[in-house]
């Protein structure tokens, strides 16, 4: 039944008034189409309107557009289509206020057409910027997807799209048109108003395919744009603007690609792992920029189709000319459609001004995520408050093996930073998870049943070798010639076997060839106490060479440390390894340990972690304690990186699928082996070490020199950015000038061009090298009473000569000039250690006058002064304590003794609130001391990613960034509140707290507990300040440092920079301990 002529005239009359009126009339028709009762009648009306103008051809359609503000016409889909299984054209309504199909959308559809038919069949598809819906409808018509969601931010096109859907889903009589599966277009297509993919996100719709022909609009303000480019051109544009990730976000926006970039990132969150995205890309920015938009976000791309279209004559491209003027980047235009050589924007602009016509490429790209689940995690992290980092993101890789390694790590790092608001407490022997993964890898791939306790983690192979030699301090050691490069020069030049005068505990190292028969001959002749060696490649294939080494070292009484770094493959198909074959069948003898330095990764050739394997509990415990004393710990980030590699090799395996074969027990070593050095032994027996918590009940650590406060988002952003960036320049990892400014602003210390600035993974590692320098000069190290116990024990471990400067509780355990002078009178070659401005562990402060007086006394006696600022930067009660000006202090000091010099030791983690992420530095100006320091070359140094991170954070601090300054103030306020609460709790529970003005710890005397008896599980005896640590730990799970650690009789140390929940539990433990020992109750105050 045809529509009445009156209905057609009434509809046209309603449309004639204006565009808004035409839209209103169309909406009224849509309402009738949506109602089943009036649907057929409304469809017949539209059919009649179309026929009214169809006879007049295109001219009549244009006349309808001008007169009635709409038109209904046919869009030809495929004139070459054979047969009748699909339509060759669609009928579409258009109104002036929406995007009308033109070259862009037709080119896009042609690109979609290049896909095989199966690519969309039965899939869930979203079209972004659907306009009047013709592509969504055409896609549904041709490929029979399960559902197509046509999305557009403009509500008017959505209404017209629904009309077009009814136009094509029903015939002219208003009857449904069914496809081969018995469905109509109404079953397959829906249209919604949506800002890009917000509709799908809000409704939790997962998509198989995302397609989009999104407008690209050039920046309308070339002056502002050129200013931005000019400011950034100092970054050298890193080969070209299109290849520099840090500026890429700007480029994408200015070229009109910003909307596509956002669509791609939104698409990552809703597309299925096997999903596909297809986008139109105008080629004006150049193919490099267009393709990098996808590549740097982790996509593999395929250019489906490319053609040229004319540049609209009314488009102003002067903005592009301005960018070219201020950069080396060149845009791509063509002269007319037939030109095949690209011309730049400036040439194109001049040609257009002279009446010429220019064109540009238009391409259709299909893109699919590589490692989609991991890339999704990365973008989920960036979306959670780290959007600024996305401009630095670069997931483009020429080598798939690099991508396979780096993308999973970035996903892991994103999850770790997202889940851990503060860095977790990890043992110094290595992160428990990492040691579990190493043990798991050895068990799964090499059938060696190790436990995490058998694995001790070191910053590097060189550090592991030196620390092991210091633990045993052998008179003679034979070391593989390939492994001596980082050993102290003194070890390589002394010759103890001549029995000449040599210092006690001096190690003599003899270089040895790696070939086993020659090495064995040396061992038999020289009878060393320790042998450190690797293995030649041809000898590592079988176990024979290893068995011979074990035998000869056992016979002569040598300890063996065997390096297998070159032979351990992190692969799912590792090659044969004779040492690991041996360990699969036999327990490692007690006199032998295995060493492996991990440097074989695809991404960072200089990122190293090492681990040692021992099955002797005495040895692996001592190695763990040695790393705690001499290094502090190994970089957590480095362990995460290699841990991720191990995890990838283990994640797909079914655990314990094969029963573990019985191993032969290790041979009993009848010959006496060298034990630990006397200084190491006495230190290990008396020092306090990390107490690991059990799985059932975690230990609350108030005994550690680190903060567990929440890590600010700015820190996490900088960490993540350091890994997502590629092509980082040397200048971006150079922290020298930033540290110079920091020490100038904070301490008035001038570190000019003559000063040497040395970086270390930890401040403790740098300090220990200074101790060795002191020993080399035959000096005496002077510690004030009430010094960080780790530092004192580290010096004792290496048998340094030390002396204590007396201090008093009523002066906050600060060094008094008279006491310092009296102590210096007694020694020659003095080295004075001063912790300040904040004293660790007491939390009191040295003023500028205080340090000036101390330096004056040191200068009089020609002492070397080590000023340790590592606990400073978080002073929360500095009223009346003037800021340091070391430059002025030193200029006022007159010393006739050339030995006087000042060394500044620092740690950035407190200054920059990077709890758990350490970066030590050392500033020296005495050239002879610098030379001595460099004679101990095994220092573990921060990786370039850490240097990039800390340079960014130092920039925020030095430039007094308001947000970053507020974060530091917030942490200071938190620490002040914690200190106040802790003092109140301690004093209410029978302790005499000394109080503090800065830092993260304070001292307190257990006055009410001394002499009291306590009997709990694992502890029985009378309490004193030495056993208070064990008593508290056994009875409550709270771990503090005893007076043995502080060095101050009767005073224990409490660290209070804990995670808020742990701090609350610590307060409860202190109260509970009082009840256990003294009886009665104590009020527990909550924490802020």
From Swiss-Prot:
Function: Catalyzes the S-methylmethionine (SMM) biosynthesis from adenosyl-L-homocysteine (AdoMet) and methionine. SMM biosynthesis (by MMT1) and degradation (by HMT-1, HMT-2 and HMT-3) constitute the SMM cycle in plants, which is probably required to achieve short term control of AdoMet level. Also able to catalyze the selenium-methylmethionine (SeMM) from AdoMet and selenium-methionine (SeMet). May play a role in phoem sulfur transport; such function is however not essential.
InterPro entries tied to this protein: Aminotransferase_I/II_large (IPR004839), Met_S-MeTrfase (IPR025779), PyrdxlP-dep_Trfase (IPR015424), PyrdxlP-dep_Trfase_major (IPR015421), PyrdxlP-dep_Trfase_small (IPR015422), SAM-dependent_MTases_sf (IPR029063)
Protein's recorded name: Methionine S-methyltransferase
Tissue specificity: Expressed in the shoot, scutellum, and aleurone cells but not in the root or endosperm.
A GO molecular-function annotation: pyridoxal phosphate binding
Recorded superkingdom: Eukaryota
Gene Ontology annotations for the cellular component aspect, listed alphabetically: cytoplasm
Gene Ontology BP annotations: biosynthetic process; methylation
């Amino acid at each position: 039944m045809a529509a009445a002529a009156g209905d057609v005239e009434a509809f046209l009359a309603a449309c004639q008034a204006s565009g808004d009126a035409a839209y209103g009339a169309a909406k009224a028709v849509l309402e009738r189409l949506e109602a089943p009762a009036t649907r057929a009648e409304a469809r017949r009306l539209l059919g009649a309107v179309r026929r009214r103008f169809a006879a007049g051809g295109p001219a009549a359609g244009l006349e309808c557009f001008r007169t009635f503000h709409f038109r209904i016409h046919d869009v030809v889909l495929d004139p070459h289509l054979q047969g009748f299984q699909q339509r060759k054209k669609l009928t579409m309504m258009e109104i002036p206020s929406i995007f009308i199909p033109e070259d862009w959308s037709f080119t896009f559809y042609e690109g979609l057409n290049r896909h095989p038919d199966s690519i969309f069949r039965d899939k869930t598809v979203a079209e972004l910027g659907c306009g009047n819906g013709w592509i969504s409808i055409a896609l549904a018509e041709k490929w029979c997807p399960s559902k197509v969601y046509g999305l557009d931010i403009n509500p008017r096109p959505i209404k017209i799209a629904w009309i077009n859907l009814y136009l094509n889903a029903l015939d002219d009589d208003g009857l449904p048109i069914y496809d081969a599966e018995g469905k109509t277009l109404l079953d397959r297509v829906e249209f919604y108003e949506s800002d890009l993919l917000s509709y799908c996100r809000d409704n939790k719709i997962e998509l198989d395919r995302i397609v989009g022909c999104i407008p690209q609009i050039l920046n309308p303000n070339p002056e502002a744009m050129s200013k931005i480019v000019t400011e950034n051109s100092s970054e050298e544009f890193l080969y070209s603007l299109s290849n520099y990730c840090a500026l890429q976000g700007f480029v994408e926006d200015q070229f009109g690609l910003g909307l596509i970039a956002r669509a791609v990132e939104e698409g990552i969150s809703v597309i299925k792992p096997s999903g596909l995205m297809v986008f139109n890309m105008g080629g004006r920015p150049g193919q490099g920029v267009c393709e990098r938009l996808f590549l740097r976000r982790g996509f593999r791309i395929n250019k489906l189709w490319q053609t040229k279209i004319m540049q609209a004559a009314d488009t102003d491209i002067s903005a592009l000319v301005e960018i070219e003027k201020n950069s080396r980047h060149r845009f791509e235009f063509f002269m007319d459609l037939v030109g095949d050589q690209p011309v730049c924007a400036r040439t194109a602009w001049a040609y257009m001004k002279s009446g010429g016509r220019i064109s540009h490429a238009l391409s259709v790209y299909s893109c699919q995520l590589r490692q989609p689940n991991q890339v999704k995690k990365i973008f989920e992290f960036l979306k959670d408050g780290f959007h600024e980092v996305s401009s630095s993101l670069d997931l483009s890789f020429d080598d798939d093996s690099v991508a396979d390694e780096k993308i999973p790590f970035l996903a892991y790092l994103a999850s770790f930073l997202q889940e851990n608001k503060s860095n977790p407490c990890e043992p110094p022997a290595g992160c428990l998870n990492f040691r579990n993964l190493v043990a798991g890898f050895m068990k799964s791939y090499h059938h060696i049943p190790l436990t995490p306790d058998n694995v001790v983690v070191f910053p590097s192979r060189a550090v592991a070798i030196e620390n092991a030699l210091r633990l045993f301090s052998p008179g003679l050691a034979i070391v593989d010639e390939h492994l001596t490069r980082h050993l102290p020069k003194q070890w390589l030049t002394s010759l103890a076997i001549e029995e000449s005068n040599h210092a006690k505990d001096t190690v003599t190292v003899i270089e040895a060839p790696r070939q086993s028969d020659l090495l064995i001959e040396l061992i038999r002749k020289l009878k060393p106490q320790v042998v450190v060696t690797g293995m030649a490649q041809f000898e590592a294939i079988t176990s024979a060479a290893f068995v011979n080494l074990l035998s000869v070292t056992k016979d002569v009484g040598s300890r063996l440390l065997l390096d297998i770094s070159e032979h351990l493959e992190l692969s799912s198909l590792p090659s044969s390894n004779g040492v690991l074959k041996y360990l699969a069948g036999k327990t490692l003898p007690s006199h032998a340990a295995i060493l492996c330095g991990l440097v074989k990764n695809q991404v960072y050739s200089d990122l190293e972690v090492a681990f040692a394997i021992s099955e002797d509990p005495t040895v692996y415990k001592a190695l763990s304690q040695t790393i705690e004393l001499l290094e502090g710990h190994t970089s957590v980030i480095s362990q995460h990186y290699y841990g991720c590699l191990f995890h990838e090799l283990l994640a797909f395996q079914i655990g314990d699928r094969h029963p573990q074969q019985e191993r032969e027990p290790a041979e009993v070593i009848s010959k006496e082996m060298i034990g630990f050095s006397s200084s190491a032994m006495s230190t290990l027996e008396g020092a306090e070490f990390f107490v690991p918590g059990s799985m059932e009940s975690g230990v609350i650590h108030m005994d550690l020199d680190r903060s567990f406060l929440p890590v600010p988002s700015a820190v996490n952003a900088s960490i993540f950015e350091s890994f997502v960036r590629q092509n980082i320049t040397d200048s971006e990892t150079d922290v020298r000038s930033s540290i110079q400014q920091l020490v100038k602003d904070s301490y008035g210390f001038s570190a000019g061009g003559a000063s040497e600035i040395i970086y270390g993974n930890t401040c403790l590692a740098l300090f220990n090298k200074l101790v060795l320098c002191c020993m080399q000069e035959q000096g005496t190290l002077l510690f004030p009473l009430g010094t960080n116990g780790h530092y004192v024990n580290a010096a004792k471990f290496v048998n340094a000569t030390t002396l204590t400067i007396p201090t008093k509780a009523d002066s906050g355990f600060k060094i008094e000039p008279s006491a310092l002078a009296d102590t210096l009178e007694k020694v020659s070659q003095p080295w004075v250690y001063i912790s300040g401005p904040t004293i660790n562990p007491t939390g009191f402060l040295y003023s500028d006058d205080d340090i000036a007086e101390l330096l004056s006394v040191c200068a009089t006696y020609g002492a070397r002064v080590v000023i340790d600022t590592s606990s400073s930067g978080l002073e929360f009660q500095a009223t009346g304590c003037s800021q340091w000006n070391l430059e002025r202090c030193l200029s006022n000091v007159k010393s006739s003794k050339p030995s006087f010099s000042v060394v500044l030791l620092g740690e950035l983690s407190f200054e920059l609130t990077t709890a758990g992420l350490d970066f030590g530095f050392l500033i020296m100006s005495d050239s002879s001391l610098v030379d001595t320091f460099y004679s101990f070359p095994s220092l573990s140094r921060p990786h370039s990613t850490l240097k990039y991170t800390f340079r960014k954070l130092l920039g925020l601090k030095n430039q007094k960034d308001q947000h970053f300054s507020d974060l530091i103030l917030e942490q200071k306020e938190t620490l002040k509140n914690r200190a106040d609460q802790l003092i109140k709790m301690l004093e209410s529970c029978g302790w005499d707290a000394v109080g503090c003005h800065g830092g993260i710890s304070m001292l307190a005397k257990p006055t009410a507990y001394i002499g009291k008896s306590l009997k709990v599980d694992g502890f029985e005896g009378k309490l004193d300040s030495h056993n208070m640590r064990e008593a508290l730990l056994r009875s409550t799970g709270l771990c503090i440092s005893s007076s043995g650690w502080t060095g101050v009789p009767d005073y224990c140390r409490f660290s209070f920079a804990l995670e808020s929940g742990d701090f609350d539990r610590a307060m409860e433990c202190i109260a509970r301990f009082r009840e256990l020992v003294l009886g009665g109750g104590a009020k527990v105050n909550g924490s802020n």
